[in-house]
Amino acid sequence: MIPPSYIGRFAPSPSGSLHFGSLVAALGSYLRAHSQQGQWLVRIEDIDPPREVPGASDNILRTLDAYGLHWHGTVLFQQQRYQVYQDQIEAFIASDLAYYCQCTRKIIQTSGGVYDGRCGRLQPRLTHGAIRIRNHVKVDHFVDKLQGPVVVDKAFAEEDFIIKRSDGLYAYQLAVVLDDAYQGITEVVRGCDLLEASCRQISLFTQLEFTPPDWLHLPLVCAEKGFKLSKQNYAPAIDVIHPQASINAALTFLGQKAVDVDSVEVMLKQAVEQFDLSTIPAQKEIVLSTIND
């Protein structure tokens, strides 16, 4: 069997129910993958147990199913991958490519707000604390398929960033890179809240000698300027009983033509057939009230 040339994914965290912003990200990545005759995977990013809501993972998967957003293969849960993350961290430390750091946010703020690598220069080495990667591949720009050229602050790009937190939890940057590489993701389609983080992920991909995926960052759904819909600010869950209206609303948000109201499977088939990347607004955020203005 010839492997697909395109593999995309939707990777929500189980911190609550899917809301309209989640639907936009899920639908955008689904349409992009299927328009490329590719695969669309689902991964549950459950590496932050204190923020998890009991039952949220099952609720998310049921909601995707109710919307006809059926995934290829089995769902990957990041908690299944803890040993992989730990093995990579230990390999980094053994090669002096990572080190322990005990600097607090207050210490970093008093030294200009950017971590200066001081713990990486200590002798003898620290043996506990957060763990930072030695950032030997400094990435301060990349080209996004929708947003175009993206440039981040040089100090941010050069910083040795955390790959395991001081509380023992694995950092998102490490987990997402190892998982995207493991699943063979060829393009990451997600919201613009992670636009700058892509530079750190490209850095990690390169240091690990993996080929970075392409990047396509969708505009964020905002209730008002600078205030995105999120589970943390109690954005309402999307309707799983009558999903058709929400599907067309999400298509409109993404600059796509509405589809005929039918079963969700028929609606998504039509949406894939008429999907046009060039009509998605190349904006970092869109306030909901302005869509039909």
UniProtKB/Swiss-Prot annotation:
GO terms for molecular function: ATP binding; glutamate-tRNA ligase activity; zinc ion binding. GO terms for cellular component: cytosol. L-glutamate binds at residues 9-13, 45, 172, 190. Zn(2+) binds at residues 101, 103, 115, 119. It holds the Pfam family tRNA-synt_1c. Catalyzes the tRNA-independent activation of glutamate in presence of ATP and the subsequent transfer of glutamate onto a tRNA(Asp). Glutamate is transferred on the 2-amino-5-(4,5-dihydroxy-2-cyclopenten-1-yl) moiety of the queuosine in the wobble position of the QUC anticodon. HAMAP family: Glu_Q_tRNA_synth. NCBIfam families: PRK05710.1-3, queuosine_YadB. This is Glutamyl-Q tRNA(Asp) synthetase. It comes from Shewanella frigidimarina (strain NCIMB 400). The gene is gluQ.
